[in-house]
């Protein structure tokens, strides 16, 4: 539990009590002050709740990232072994795929730069 939540709850309670005293005494200023303190306490309590939620979400995300990092070596190794098996099973297909990828990359890299369209100006 966050400090802001505790302080906010205390302010909210104090504001309710002050508002009740203002109601009993018939003092509008005390009643308004109590309502203002209650509202401030509610806002601070909500702020503390939001901070707690963000903290929990960041801890969860960090845990997921750590798990993904820990398992990345195994995943890479398994993928490499699967590709090696496919290449051994069908070497001609692997050669054609590699050639196609190389050809596509060569086309992308050797493409001429686009020129801007000519501007036609009328001088008259």
From Swiss-Prot:
InterPro entries, sorted: CsbD, UPF0337_stress_rsp, YjbJ_sf
Pfam families membership: CsbD
Superkingdom as given in the UniProt entry: Bacteria
Family the UniProt entry places it in: Belongs to the UPF0337 (CsbD) family.
PANTHER family listed in its UniProt record: UPF0337 PROTEIN YJBJ
Protein name: UPF0337 protein blr1496
Organism per entry: Bradyrhizobium diazoefficiens (strain JCM 10833 / BCRC 13528 / IAM 13628 / NBRC 14792 / USDA 110)
Organism lineage: Bacteria, Pseudomonadati, Pseudomonadota, Alphaproteobacteria, Hyphomicrobiales
């Amino acid at each position: 539990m966050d400090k802001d939540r505790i302080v906010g709850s205390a302010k909210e309670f104090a504001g309710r009590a002050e508002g009740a005293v203002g109601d009993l005494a018939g003092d509008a200023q005390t009643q308004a002050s109590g309502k203002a303190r209650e509202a401030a306490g509610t806002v601070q309590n909500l702020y503390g709740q939001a901070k707690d939620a963000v903290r929990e979400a960041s801890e969860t995300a960090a845990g997921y990232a750590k798990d993904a990092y820990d398992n990345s070596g195994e995943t890479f190794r398994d993928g490499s072994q699967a590709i090696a098996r496919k290449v051994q099973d069908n070497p001609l297909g692997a050669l054609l795929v590699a050639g196609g990828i190389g050809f596509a990359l060569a086309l992308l890299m050797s493409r001429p730069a686009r020129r801007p369209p000519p501007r036609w100006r009328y001088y008259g």
